[in-house]
Design a protein with these regions (language model features):
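Helicase-core coupling region on the C-terminal RecA-like lobe
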Residues: 1-80, 144-145
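A short beta-strand-to-loop transition that corresponds to the Sensor-1 phosphate-sensing loop
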Residues: 2-4, 114-115, 152
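A short acidic (Asp/Glu
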Residues: 9-12, 116-123, 146
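Structural motif
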Residues: 49, 111, 150-152
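Conserved helicase motor "Helicase C" RecA-like lobe of SF1/SF2 P-loop NTPases
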Residues: 80-138
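Conserved RecA-like P-loop NTPase helicase motor core
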Residues: 132-152
């Protein structure tokens, strides 16, 4: 089964655990664009895993959860993404993902499982240059594609 959306490193876990090694990474240059980037902890692995300790909370009038620490970290990542993608220090960014190829915020998506978290992130980004980023739940993202994701 050919996958054209993700880098082979990202496909490895689901391929091993769920697809019996039937997935084949066939992405274009965009799936390899971050390889070698100085913003990655491992420049050969185009994903950042970031554990964020925090407390799941709820508003009194809502059953949906949110985590303030996650909201603040997502905001920081989004602002850094805009800062770097907009040209300031973008030398460290791969050419394919500099502003001329990555439209910040239009090509960036933030995915979270909780509607309460969606609302908090949207509010946190509302006064920033990243206010146009699509922030949605997993269900809302089904079948949509962005060049870069910030999942929670």
């Amino acid at each position: 089964m050919k996958n054209f959306r993700s880098h082979a490193s990202i496909l490895q876990y689901p391929n091993d655990c769920f697809y019996k090694n039937d997935l084949e990474a066939c992405g274009n240059q965009h799936t390899n664009a971050f390889i070698g980037s100085t913003i990655l902890p491992n420049p050969n692995y185009p994903i950042i895993f970031h554990a964020i300790p925090g407390l799941d909370q709820r508003e009194a009038n809502s059953p949906s959860f949110f985590n303030v620490d996650e909201v603040l970290q997502v905001k920081a990542y989004a602002e850094e993404l805009h800062r770097l993608g907009a040209g300031e220090n973008c030398v460290s960014w791969p050419k394919a993902l500099r502003l001329n190829d990555l439209t910040v915020p239009d090509d960036v998506g933030i995915i979270t499982p909780y509607h309460g978290q969606v609302l908090k992130i949207r509010k946190a980004l509302a006064t920033t240059a990243m206010s146009g980023v699509k922030v949605a739940s997993v269900e809302e993202y089904q079948g949509q594609v962005w060049k870069m994701y910030i999942p929670l």
